[in-house]
Each structure stands twice: as structure tokens, then as C-alpha cells.
Curated annotation (Swiss-Prot):
SMART domains: GARS_A
Record domain ATP-grasp: where: 146-340
Biological-process GO terms, alphabetical: cell wall organization; peptidoglycan biosynthetic process; regulation of cell shape
Catalyses which reaction(s): 2 D-alanine + ATP = D-alanyl-D-alanine + ADP + phosphate + H(+)
EC number: 6.3.2.4
Protein name, as recorded: D-alanine--D-alanine ligase
Species whose genome carries this gene: Pediococcus pentosaceus (strain ATCC 25745 / CCUG 21536 / LMG 10740 / 183-1w)
Gene behind the chain: ddl
Amino acid sequence: MKIAVLAGGKSTERNVSLSSGSKITNALRSKGYDATMIDLFLGYELEDGQSYEDVFKSSNTSTDYEISDAVLTEEDIEELRTDGTVGLFGKNVLPILQAADFVFLALHGGDGENGKVQAVLDLNHIKYTGSGSLASGIAMDKAISKEIMLYNNIKTAQFAVLHAKDGIHPQLAFDYPMVVKPNSGGSSIGTRIVHDEAELAESLKDAYRFDDEIIVEEFITGREFSLGVVNGQAMPAIEIVVNDGWYDYEHKFQTGSTTKFVTPPEIEDDVHDEMKRVAVQTMDALGMTNYGRVDFLTNDTGVYVIEANNLPGMTPLSLLPQEAEAAGISYEDLCESIVLGKQKLYDELKK
């Protein structure tokens, strides 16, 4: 099977995506698939005489990509392309994807995760991993997804949606501390915990650099967990223990982080079972399929969903691979099961 691992793009999570993509490519090759990584935005330069199908015959191996400390803006990334064009799909990308039997989406954030790339693939009858275009857009939009959660009686934090016209000194219905985050962001980029009006104003200024729409949530004190769902099966939860601060971009992706991951977590069986049930319920409510990850906070008042991730990270430090490992599933088997699980869904649609 020829598999194009689509990574990169031009979101602020580009570096994380390239790390996920390189590891996925290596894993699929180790399972015998003809896999190659394609940079969505920078494209692929064909060699003389090379066809689109030949791209998958390359013997080159993908090396693990180091995640940089710096977060690139969209303008920074556009400068990386030397042909002067700014369209999302780089040179030769779409024809290569059409030549593939399957596309493994290793994209994170922006148009790679909000359903737009998925819609292009749907229109071109290209099979891909993860949720469809509508569910991807819903899951990426924190405000809409939280409204759907509340409608389905899934506990989540109180929140307000702000726009630039609301200014940086809004009147909110809940007290400090609060959490400020871009509505359609990921990897905790632009996210901060604020304790007073001055910090709120400064955080809103920063968050508006990444999104025109901002979510401000009540801060819920509790233990933080993450739980993946693969092909309808909930993985063991993993507890995230941060000793210095909170689980931000640096703690998620930098190897020097002091963050501890505990799996299986030391929690009561009924709480663990409840998180598994709510994770599956949340994905079903949002229309998500194939695989995803749901993040939680728990305390004496219950289990609260922070958010659902429709294309969770697959880097060496990412949560879903650690959860799968705790369930006895190797990284290589996890990648293969995602492809085969989505293929099964496509086959069922034909019946």
C-alpha cells in the first residue's frame, strides 16, 4: 500500500506536525508500507524522470524531526517557500496524494486540522485518516465543540467567546483565575492562565496574534488526564503531572521538561471507567471517527472535558502513543491500526 504522510503546512504547529510525520513515516515503513512524508505547504520536487507513483518507491528513510523552541508564525512559514506562491497546497502535493492509496494526516492546527484539507481530499476522492471535514471543523472550534458537549450533558468549564471588538478589558461572569486560549489553536500555543485584569489584558493581546476569536474559561482545579480513543476503543488514561507551572507548549514538546506522565494512573476504577465512557461519548457527540484524544480535569465534583483533539500529536513525547503503549500496542501497530481502521470505515460506506 502506498501511503503519503501529509505533514508540515503553515500553522503555528508546523514543527510538531513534522515531528509526528517523520515518526509515522518510519513506523509505517517498518510495517512494510511504501510510505513517504510530504510537506503540505513546501511541496515535493520531483527528480528528473520521476513520476508521482515513483515517490513512494524512494529508499530514503525519514529521520526523527527535532521540534524547535521557536513557534513560527504563518508569515515566517510563507517565507520558506521560494517560488512566490502562497496557496496551502505546495508543488506536486495534490497529484502525489492522488497517486497514493491512502493519506495519513499528520497535520496539526490551522487548515490542516479544521476540516479544510479534509474537504479538499473528499472532493478528490482521496482516502485519509482521522475524522471527516465537518467533524474536524467542529472539534477544532472550541466554542462550538463546548456548546455541543453541554447539549449532550458532558461537563466542561464555563466559558466566554471574545472577539477583537470586545477589547482587552471584558466583563466576564466568572472569577479569576481564568484560562485564555485561541479558539481554534492547538499545542497550547497562545494559551495562558491569568490571575488578574492586567494579566488578562496582556494574555488577550498575545492570543489575538494567533486567532481572531478567543476563549476565556473558568480555571478548574484538579488532576489533569488525557485519554485516546482508537477505532472506538478507549485507551488507558494518562495523568499529566507538571512540577513547575502548567502543561504548556514547552512542557509538551521539549525534551528537558520536568513533566511526568503516569500510566496507568493511580485513580479509582470508577473514575477511570467514567473518563473512558465520556471520551467515547464526546467523540461520538462531535462526529469524530477513527481516532482522537480527549483531555480531562477531575476533582471531587466530577470529570470535566477540557477539549477533544481530532488529530492528536504523534511525536516521541505525545500522549496518544504513550497511552497505546500502556495498552500493549506498539507505536508501529498504532499507526497501522489507524490506517486499517479508517479503511474499514470507507469499506462500510460502500455497502
